[in-house]
Design a protein with these regions (language model features):
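Conserved structural motif at the start of ABC-family nucleotide-binding domains
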Residues: 5, 19-22
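The feature captures the beta-strand-to-loop junction immediately N-terminal to the Walker
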Residues: 36-38
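A short, proline-enriched helix->beta-strand linker immediately N-terminal to the Walker B motif
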Residues: 156-160
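Conserved ABC ATPase signature
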Residues: 137-141, 145
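ABC ATPase nucleotide-binding domains
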Residues: 240-268
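Helix-to-loop junction immediately C-terminal to a conserved catalytic motif
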Residues: 51
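Conserved ABC transporter NBD signature motif
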Residues: 59-67
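Catalytic Walker B motif of ABC-type/P-loop ATPase nucleotide-binding domains
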Residues: 162-166
Length: 268
């Protein structure tokens, strides 16, 4: 399987500060990569560098073999869809209007949305199962619904790579599950090639649930890259997070979870 996204010996930072270096990994079309690591480990800065919001300090980012260095913003927007953490918002757009903004790279900032743009937005809303929210006020929907709408906006861009910054942060358990299920479906595709997905989280269980690969960042370096089972081990969690955990298989399918040893002792 050929690489859709390739990161080669990447160094990244901002201002005068180098945050990370020597980072390399590949992700194929239809694969989900989970980015794990402690606070301050460089995840957000790495994302900004992948997206071209910060220039790389060294190394390369390639999409389908093409070096993205020097790409203009419009070309980047056609390759990368970005889903930030869902904030409360400030303007009373409808959900449909918010999703239509994802079509800007296809039409220009000052052009009216075309019939094709509206169709793409409607298709994204329906694919995420939120077509019923189309006329709702963006400021009056729940955090989980806003997160789904942001994913729909990125999907309307028709990107090749979807980047999500902690997509389940501040969501309740049910909405976390629904968002993760949708992310996995987008990678799997609907009768065709799925998206390449890169998402960050602080919850190793989410990597076990939906990721094909895990990149574990620690101190700006790639501590380990591989399958969730290869990366998320008791030894690596101790080394990177300074926490004793037990990685156990649960349920009929044997999905793995991390159990903090200290908390288990407190609970008897």
């Amino acid at each position: 399987m050929s690489a859709r996204l390739s990161v080669e010996d990447l160094a990244f930072g901002y201002g005068e500060r180098v945050v990370g270096a020597g980072v390399g990994f590949t992700v194929a079309a239809g694969e989900v990569l989970c980015l794990l690591g402690p606070n301050g480990g460089g995840k957000t800065t790495l994302f900004k560098t992948l997206l071209g919001l910060l220039p790389p300090r060294g190394g390369r980012v390639r999409v389908d073999g093409e070096d993205t260095a020097g790409w203009p913003p419009r070309r980047r927007a056609l390759a990368f869809g970005y889903v930030p953490q869902a904030g409360a918002g400030q303007f009373p757009f409808t959900v449909r209007e918010m999703v239509l903004m994802g079509r800007t790279a296809h039409r220009g900032a000052f052009s009216a949305p075309s019939v094709a743009d509206h169709a793409a937005a409607e298709a994204a809303l329906e694919r995420l199962g939120i077509g019923h929210l189309a006329e709702r006020d963006w400021l009056r929907i729940s955090g989980g619904e806003r997160q789904m709408a942001l994913i729909a906006r990125a999907l309307a861009q028709a990107p090749r790579v979807l980047v999500l910054d902690e997509p389940t942060a501040s969501l309740d358990f049910g909405n976390q599950v629904r968002v993760l299920e949708q992310v996995r479906r987008l990678a799997d595709g609907e009768g065709g090639e799925g998206l390449t997905v890169v998402f960050s989280t602080h919850h190793p269980e989410q990597a076990f649930a939906i990721a094909d690969r895990v990149a574990l960042l620690h101190g700006g370096r790639l501590a380990r890259f591989g399958t969730p089972e290869e990366v998320i081990t008791a030894a690596m969690m101790r080394e990177v997070y300074g926490t004793e955990v037990e990685v156990v298989a649960v349920g009929a399918d044997g999905m793995r979870v991390c159990l903090p040893v200290g908390l288990r002792r407190r609970m008897g």
